[in-house]
Amino acid sequence: MIFLKNICKNIGENAILKNVSLSIEKGEFVAIIGQSGSGKTSLLNIIGTLDTPSSGTYVFDEYEVTKLNNDEKARLRREKIGFIFQRYNLLSLLSAKENVSLPAVYAGKNLQERSQNAKKLLNDLELAHKLDSKPNELSGGQQQRVSIARALINGGELILADEPTGALDSKSGIMVLEILQKLNEQGHTIVLVTHDPKIAAQAKRVIEIKDGEILSDTKKEKAQEKLILKTMPKEKKTLTLLKNQAFECFKIAYSSILAHKLRSILTMLGIIIGIASVVCVVALGLGSQAKVLESIARLGTNTIEIRPGKGFGDLRSGKTRLNFSDLETLRSLEYLEAVDAHSNTSGVATYTNISLSARAEGVGVNNFAIEGLRIDAGRILNNDDVKNSTNVAVLDFNAKKNLFPDEKSENILGRVVLFNSQPFKIIGVLQKDTDKPIEDNVVRFYIPYTTLMNKLTGDRNLREIIVKVKDDVSSTLAENAIIRILEIKRGQKDFFTFNSDTFKQAITANKRTTTILTACVAVIALIVGGIGVMNIMLVSVSERTREIGIRMAIGARREDIMMQFLIEAVMICTIGAILGVILSIFVIFAFNTLSTDFPMILNAYSVLLGLLSSMFIGVVFGFFPARNAANLNPISALSKE
């Protein structure tokens, strides 16, 4: 079963084992005796595949151990070898039953099977009443019996006992030795390390070691048969094994987080702030963007303004005029929903003893809808008003406020106001325009454009034509078509257009840029939080080095250890993300309750993005601590206090 030839172990310049050669048959009970520092524990660790010899050949169950990789050695420990340690090496957060079941988790056995086997073993060892007890609730003898049960859960063909009675009273020590003798009688191979000759005498074979060399062996040597070596088959990953890995990792991660509540919360704080920032920034951006777009919509979506000249501020635009022929041409286009003229002039408005500067806006019937003007009282202009050049006016909020400061809108309907000495009957009052980005104090009278031309200015040309494009038509294509048609009609391009969608797109692009810049700050907060997670995980690996060594000793693969710490990092980040989302919901609710300017809009995609990004942060910043844990040497890890 075990064959060692010329095994040497060196640590620096010190030779711990010197050309040790021995063989152990299946079913033997062997005691290795020696004083402290003799090399007996180092030899046991090499036999148990926890340590690697500096030179020599080691064959276990026809596998050449010195040529196996770490995971293949872990498989041998998991399937063939059971350890009984002097200090028990039970995991403090797990119950007796859970400690016993742990090697079966890594072996891929289902929950029912490993639970039944653990109960049976503990019952056989007279611990049926201690199934749910934690190690600190057990005596030394009881803890060692739990350790024995753990060594047997996967079969334990080879039991390696390192000073199993060293920390026990005499009664408990005798009980442990009796258990080992019974196990040997049942066919288990036992290798016992001790410094006590009385304990060694309980074995059927005694090997004495001193200064790394075998002094004596009570077994008579026989001719060595030719060794038959075999290659270890590739381990198949079953669904049960994967479920066991995931469940165990989540359970340990959860227990670890609960065991260090304050530290975990402080670690999560960076993630909480980062995720809350991401969600709130997106909500703020969406809310302000929606408000701006709503304002643009009220001012007129899909609208195009046609003005004379080469552009805004063109000093020669006064020499160019739009006319009614242009207006009628545009009205004939089927892809335009509405077309109307717009002109204006400045003057003085008078009511009783109040006189003030004002502007008369000559508009058509459709201008109110196109520009998003909302009526507060009365009515807007109709076709008869425009056709007959009627002296009627719709006052804006500023006009009503300055001319009729203490009266309700409906009470001033029908009254007459003078504008440049022309009387105008008030037929309507507009609501306050809250959608303008900059509030102005201009007093406006909305009158028929025909009235303005015929009775105020005498100018038959138009200052502006406003069109509204149908919803199913691209405003850009419509704008290009209008330019082409008017250019052909007028013989030259002596006008320019302003498309409201261009403004809308500029606002959207600006908001997108602002959101990205603000989101970058949130991402930086996430990265800072991730660095905090990595720091704490490195501390956690350092604190739990002994636990890692125990898990490796009972057969945990490198990927099991790595997954355990990686899932813990991801769990910390995910819990932090969930708390961050909850915090952001409270912030959004409070903001929407207190603010009337615009709402914050919670976006499901930003929440999902926050959760996914937190998991990504957990994987990225948890990888290095997890890798460090997986690369630990089992012997170094077990010796860590």
Swiss-Prot record:
Compartments where located: Cell inner membrane
Classification via SUPFAM superfamilies: P-loop containing nucleoside triphosphate hydrolases (SSF52540)
Gene Ontology cellular component annotations, sorted alphabetically: plasma membrane
Single GO term (MF): transmembrane transporter activity
The keyword Translocase appears for this protein: yes
EC number: 7.6.2.-
GO BP annotations, alphabetical order: response to antibiotic
Binding locations of ATP: G34, Q35, S36, G37, S38, G39, K40, T41
Topology relative to the membrane: Multi-pass membrane protein
Top enzyme category: translocase
Keywords: Antibiotic resistance, ATP-binding, Cell inner membrane, Cell membrane, Membrane, Nucleotide-binding, Translocase, Transmembrane, Transmembrane helix, Transport
Pfam families: ABC_tran, FtsX, MacB_PCD
Segments forming domain ABC transporter: 2-236
Principal location listed in the UniProt entry: membrane
Segments passing through the bilayer: 265-285, 519-539, 571-591, 604-624
Gene3D superfamilies the record matches: P-loop containing nucleotide triphosphate hydrolases
Subunit structure: Homodimer.
Function field: Non-canonical ABC transporter that contains transmembrane domains (TMD), which form a pore in the inner membrane, and an ATP-binding domain (NBD), which is responsible for energy generation. Confers resistance against macrolides.
Family the UniProt entry places it in: Belongs to the ABC transporter superfamily. Macrolide exporter (TC 3.A.1.122) family.
Protein name: Macrolide export ATP-binding/permease protein MacB
Lineage: Bacteria, Pseudomonadati, Campylobacterota, Epsilonproteobacteria, Campylobacterales
